């Protein structure tokens, strides 16, 4: 993507999200007979259906059409606002009867237009029954795209998996009246249930993990390796900034949102639906840990200087913070912090059943949690900065004089914060109790530092065009100088402290490498 394409892409982002918002609003304003509501029980003759979809879709799925075998108009079931990022769980109520999936729909940007991608499901998945007062759990479907989009069509595979959808957790957290009505009743499923992975599923998972999307929570570990989470339970690691990506499979289907390498060849990772997994042999085998409820997304994991481990789990309106002396030992909750909704850059509108007001997926920006040698740092509810002191085991919370979009905490405790649009960068050396104004940008990524004084960030300096620049500081972030114009839209910058080699991750999921102080860039796998 060249500079002209970057300008066009940025200019159309607002139109894209407004189009999605309008699409979601229309579906709910018309009223949806399949929608479940928080306090309403099922009507006589109604049952519940759930289906989870995972994989490498271009956009999140928003609608699932189910046709009754007796004919008539297909029923539309919407994706729930549950603990998912790229995955989706469809849930709704249907009159008792027999049904088959007809198609899935997703809103898709094509040039300057927002259109609907439709994937036919007829004869690809099977049939199922809905009975009054019971749940039909259709489990998990894996979706994989092949090749490029041509005239709103793309070659794809849709395959059933034996993994169940999270019915109990979803119903209890969002629809308690329905959960009480179906409690203790055996769940239904497909007419021909999937009891083991089919050869087609194995192949689709191999294809999907081979071109897996997502570079979540990318960070530089001690020793110089770069780690990131991805879809379909995959981790990505570069043994150095200059090395290629290598994939590690955890065996899960959830998207991995956070990963932390630990001493003694251990790896801790977390993601959708409360997933927490541990490897003690550098990724060759994995054990799932029970730490947080499945209605939360694990958005951060890390190891402290003392050898303890910390994780942060995002809920609908709060964060839970957990800590353990060892991942295999008992975890204890050390904090619960209210959060602001709708802060994520490039937020994706969800269409939770039963809501006439469009809500949004609630993951915060991935740079809002950081570990230092002395404290855990969390920026959460608008102007609130919270730090947990490992020595005293106490929280300290302060109100910031700005709304931050990125936050960064250095190992020595120095903090940096970047407001979302057109404001100064700020720095603090007293855990957020006082702040100093630094340089001024229209937009910027979180900075990456090679030393106390030398750092890099991708930014649009104030007063410039929409082209992003790579910037460098040699005075501890007080002033920044341009190194180069970027032909891609950056999301995160990582620097190797030893060589000053730079790795940049783009919004489109691409990876770029610079070995000359950010002056030139090459695509890197």
Feature-to-residue mapping (PLM):
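Repeated scaffold domains used in trafficking and secretory/extracellular systems
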Residues: 213-217, 255-259, 296-302, 341-348, ...
């Amino acid at each position: 993507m060249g500079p002209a394409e970057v300008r066009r892409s940025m200019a159309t982002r607002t139109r894209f999200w407004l189009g999605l918002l309008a699409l979601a609003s229309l579906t709910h304003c018309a009223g949806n007979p399949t929608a479940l509501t928080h306090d309403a029980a099922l009507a006589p003759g109604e049952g519940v259906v759930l289906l989870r979809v995972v994989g490498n879709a271009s956009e999140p799925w928003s609608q699932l059409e189910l046709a009754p075998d007796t004919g008539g108009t297909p029923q539309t079931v919407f994706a729930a606002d549950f603990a998912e990022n790229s995955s989706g769980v469809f849930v709704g109520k249907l009159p008792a009867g027999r049904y088959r999936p007809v198609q899935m729909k997703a809103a898709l940007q094509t040039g300057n237009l927002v259109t609907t991608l439709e994937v036919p499901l007829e004869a690809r998945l099977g049939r199922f029954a809905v009975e009054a007062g019971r749940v039909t759990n259709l489990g998990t479907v894996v979706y994989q795209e092949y090749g490029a989009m041509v005239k709103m069509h793309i070659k794809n595979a849709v395959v059933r998996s034996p993994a169940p959808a999270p019915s109990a957790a979803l119903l209890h957290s969002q629809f308690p009246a329905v959960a009480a009505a179906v409690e203790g009743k055996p769940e239904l499923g497909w007419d021909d249930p999937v009891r083991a992975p089919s050869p087609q599923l194995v192949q689709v998972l191999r294809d999907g993990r081979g071109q897996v999307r997502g570079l979540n929570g990318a960070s530089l570990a001690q020793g110089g390796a770069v780690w990131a989470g991805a879809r379909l339970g995959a981790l990505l690691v570069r043994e150095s900034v200059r090395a290629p990506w290598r994939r590690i499979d955890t065996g899960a289907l959830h998207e991995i949102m956070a990963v932390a390498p630990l001493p003694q060849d251990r790896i801790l990772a977390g993601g959708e639906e409360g997933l927490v997994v541990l490897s003690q042999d550098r990724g060759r085998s994995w054990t799932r840990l029970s730490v947080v409820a499945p209605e939360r997304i694990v958005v951060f994991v890390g190891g402290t200087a003392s050898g303890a481990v910390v994780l942060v789990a995002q809920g609908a309106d709060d964060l839970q913070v957990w800590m353990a002396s060892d991942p295999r030992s008992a975890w204890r909750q050390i904090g619960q912090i209210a959060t602001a909704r709708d802060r994520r850059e490039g937020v994706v509108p969800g269409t939770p059943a039963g809501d006439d007001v469009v809500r949004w997926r609630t993951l915060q920006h991935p740079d809002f949690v950081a570990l230092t040698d002395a404290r855990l740092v969390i920026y959460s509810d608008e102007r609130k900065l919270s730090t947990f002191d490992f020595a005293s085991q106490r929280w300290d919370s302060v109100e910031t004089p700005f709304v931050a979009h990125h936050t960064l905490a250095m190992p020595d405790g120095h903090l940096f914060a970047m407001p979302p649009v057109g404001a100064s960068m700020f720095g603090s050396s007293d855990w957020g109790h006082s702040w100093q104004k630094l340089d001024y940008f229209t937009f910027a990524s979180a900075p990456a530092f090679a030393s106390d004084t030398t750092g890099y960030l991708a930014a649009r300096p104030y007063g410039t065009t929409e082209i992003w620049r790579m910037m460098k500081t040699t005075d501890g972030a007080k002033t920044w100088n341009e190194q180069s114009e970027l032909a891609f839209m950056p999301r995160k910058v990582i620097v190797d402290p030893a060589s000053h080699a730079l790795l940049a991750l783009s919004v489109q999921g691409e990876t770029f490498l610079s070995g000359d102080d950010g002056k030139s860039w090459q695509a890197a796998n």
